[in-house]
Amino acid sequence: MEENKSINSRFENLEDRMLFYRGRHEQHLPRNSYVMIMCDGRSFSQKIKKKFKQPFDSVFIDAMNDTCAYLCSQIQGAVCGYVQSDEISIFMTNVQTPESTLFYDGRLVKLLSIVSSIATSFFNKKMMEYSINGIFNESDIKNAISEAPLYQFDCKCWDLPSLNDVMGWFLFRSTDCTRNSKQQAAQTYLSHKELMGKHTDEQIELLKEKKGIDWHTEYNDGEKYGRIIFKEQEHHTGTFNGKTVEYERSVWKSHYNKDLTIPENREWLLEIIKRSGVDFSCDSVSRNVTNMLDESYEKAKQIQSDLTLISDINEYFPNELPLFCEEFDSKDYISKLQELRSDIKKLKQVCEKDDES
């Protein structure tokens, strides 16, 4: 109650007070940052299984690609998009000058609500076109529209510290796409009992063995690795003042993605991003991003291995654990870890000798 009185005393009129309430939890993305926007289909699984062919349906894939392309055309600063399953990722930035601002000034609430509503409305439009395609009777069209499911997308948004991390996100989602693609293909033709306990690579081997369907050759790269959407120039010919003129027009188009676990294919994607017209020269990581990715995965593996030490630290040096966690992201992390590893090794040796005696 006292807090409300204090707030009320700051404002001379109702409008200012209401606007204060509306905006006091407003969040902004930082200026000149690399931003990833992700739209994810809400409860798509059952709707897709009922309406579309399995494991992949070109109508659904085209609708997702078109939705991503349309989103990119509507988002100021969009660099490229990635589509897999019912998921869209869009890389957005504006790093040209210190004064550059992001889409909707980086206001998270505004950005998330606008992007999710654009994705939802456009995708439903594409689905409606598909539902009434080839129907000419008015009552049948009305029935098709009334029976058509409504699709919704949620939206998430976050900033990334470097182009290296942008590439890492696309690799992460592409790897997930490949795993899902293998599972979808196997689950379409094989029973749950046949697939139980098998890794995805084992599943597609079984699919080839039992059904003669080779995942590697049966499906295109877009179905296996997702699709990349980026802007490219189209050559056009038209008439102006009675004269034939030629001109270029920028359009957002979808292309099959490649296996991004292969370094050469990551270089291919990096070149697409760099051709977007955005100046990445300020990002020192971008100069050697593919090698940096390889190095970061090796470091990630090492960190994952190092994390197994936490239980030992907690057992032998419980007072050190909070300090260790605080320093996990610092430059002193490696040296601290090596020191603790050495101490734990010595202590374990002492404990083993005590046990023997």
Predicted regions and their residues:
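Regulatory and interdomain segments flanking nucleotide-handling catalytic cores
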Residues: M1-S357
